[in-house]
């Protein structure tokens, strides 16, 4: 359950999740929240309902928190640590989300973030690389400064080494213990259905996009209309590439299982791509599986980062009501999107 602050109205969320579990065979529920909505009394309402809660902290460095306008909004490093400590142990999995590779972030600042996160001992720690696009790069430069050196690969190596005693779930997620709940649903589910305004679905080789405007979405639902306002169709090879990316992000693909699921021959369909990855020592074939190397794991983090950055550009198009009203058809790949 995404959208940033899904716990902002706990009573409504609880009713919604209980209805979903009643109507559908839902086995696991993961929710997002922020540091202002992890009060123990409120979290206790969701025992037996929410299996994992992800909380965006971004950093424990006060100077960085001030630069990204989170210090006054969510509290200082000390206050954040106190909030998290009280929130732990209520729901099965609490995921603490950090961001690394801020412009001007030092190795010392990164290690301090990692040490604090580890000392708090949440069940899961997720470390996202800073995601920049044409939409956000100017604002990032304005608030955090211009990047003189990109430390992403170096910092990623530090992170992996720091959490070598943890279970690595995928490219950027680490757990105290092995768990089956994947924090990136796109890598564990080839198809998914999005419900709600602005939600994405991927079904039968098509990306479907729901209306972003809440009033438009509500009207469509009330009138029992299809809430999809756009879709994009993918070729068979594009689908194979997409699923290959999302599965390799988790570090390993069983070739026979992949072929059986997609009714394809992976090594034939993506011969050139696999050859390039093998030559660059990003992946290797071992016992019928494709496995990422340390460099390969980072490479797929970069690719997944670009995937999410691209989805942000799609969101920007469909949030622009003027653009939507003036066009009968939108080609996402050809839209000129100005920075904000």
Locations of regions flagged by a protein language model:
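Charged, E/D/K/R/S-rich low-complexity terminal regions of large eukaryotic assembly subunits
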Residues: 201-340
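C-terminal scaffold of the Radical SAM
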Residues: 2-264
């Amino acid at each position: 359950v995404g959208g940033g602050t899904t716990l902002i109205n706990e009573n409504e969320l609880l009713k919604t999740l209980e209805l979903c579990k009643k109507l559908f065979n839902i086995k696991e529920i993961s929710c997002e929240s922020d540091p202002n909505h992890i009060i123990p009394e409120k979290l206790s309402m969701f025992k037996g309902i929410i299996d994992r809660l992800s909380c965006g902290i971004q950093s424990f460095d006060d100077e960085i928190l001030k630069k990204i306008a989170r210090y006054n909004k969510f509290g200082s490093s000390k206050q954040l640590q106190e909030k998290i400590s009280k929130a732990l142990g209520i729901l099965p999995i609490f995921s603490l989300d950090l961001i690394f590779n801020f412009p001007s972030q030092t190795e010392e600042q990164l290690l301090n973030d990692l040490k604090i996160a580890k000392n708090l001992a949440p069940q899961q720690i997720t470390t996202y690389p800073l995601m920049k696009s044409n939409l956000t790069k100017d604002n990032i430069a304005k608030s955090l400064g211009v990047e003189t050196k990109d430390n992403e690969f170096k910092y990623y190596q530090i992170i992996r080494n720091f959490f070598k005693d943890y279970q690595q779930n995928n490219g950027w997620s680490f757990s105290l213990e092995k768990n089956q709940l994947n924090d990136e649903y796109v890598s564990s589910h080839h198809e998914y259905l999005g419900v709600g305004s602005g939600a994405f679905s991927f079904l039968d080789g098509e990306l479907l996009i729901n209306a972003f405007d809440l009033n438009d979405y509500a009207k469509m639902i009330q009138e029992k209309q299809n809430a999809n306002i756009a879709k994009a169709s993918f070729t068979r090879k594009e689908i194979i590439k997409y699923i290959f990316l999302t599965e390799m992000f988790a570090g390993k693909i069983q070739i026979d299982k992949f072929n059986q699921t997609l009714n394809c021959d992976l090594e034939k369909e993506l011969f050139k791509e696999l050859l390039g990855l093998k030559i660059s020592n990003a992946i290797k074939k071992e016992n019928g599986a494709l496995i990422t190397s340390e460099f390969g794991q980072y490479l797929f983090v970069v690719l997944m980062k670009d995937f999410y950055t691209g989805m942000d550009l799609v969101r920007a198009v469909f949030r622009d009501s003027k653009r939507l009203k003036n066009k009968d058809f939108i080609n996402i790949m050809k839209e000129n999107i100005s920075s904000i």
